Amino acid sequence: LNRSVKIKQVVDALEHYAPLPLQEGYDNAGLQVGLTEAVEMSGALLCLDVTEAVVDEAIRKGCNLIVSHHPLIFRKLARISDENYVQRTVRKAIKNDITIVAMHTNMDAAAGGVNFKIAEKLGLRNVQFFAGEKEVDGVKGGEGVIGEVAEDLAADDLVLMLKERFGVECVQCNQLLRRPIRKVALCGGAGAFLLDAAIKAGADAFITGEMSYHEYFCHEQEIQICVIGHYQSEQFTGEIFRSIIQENFPDAKCCISEINTNPILYL
């Protein structure tokens, strides 16, 4: 028996797991497009970014809810026309009665959120926050996590593990660390702001999605920097959304998007 689930119930479950007040001040997580109150959910499509192709996929799969990591509407929209992909995507969603919700820096910060998922993929133990700790509605939050590998790794073996588990062909690193790596700190997406905190926390390695040129300097033999790509670092976020929805609504239809929305090609 498929008991009907309202979109609002699903959104509430997601926000209970990662309360919106955990988000950064600059962010626009939460409802992006559409209605939640009285609408029954036909299915949820889970993704990292919402593009027109993702809305088409939702239509094809009979999903009237899209849950994304990155907000579709980040900067204020001056108008809704067809000048750029955001406007076109908003129009397409509205025309097809699709509701779009984003769980961004609130899901980055939440216990069991994006960074914990990355740590899980790396098999880290004793995973805990090492910076920016706070608590909202009984949910603990923080800016980055640190944990220990099961057994000490050489730097090149850590790089190999990242390539395998995150499906990347290239990892941007500073000079390879000559001591074994035990403590690993990480932050999905753009995490360079946590590099100093990672060093202070005693990390042997710091893994993130993107860093700029000058941020790599002056850390030789102090910490191993591994940068795997913004999209690549957060690619498993849909699995978090899926487990929250399945746990609360076992009969609800939810599927992870098959579209790779990474705009960066590695050629």
Residue ranges of model-derived segments:
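Hydrophobic structural segments
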Residues: L1-L267
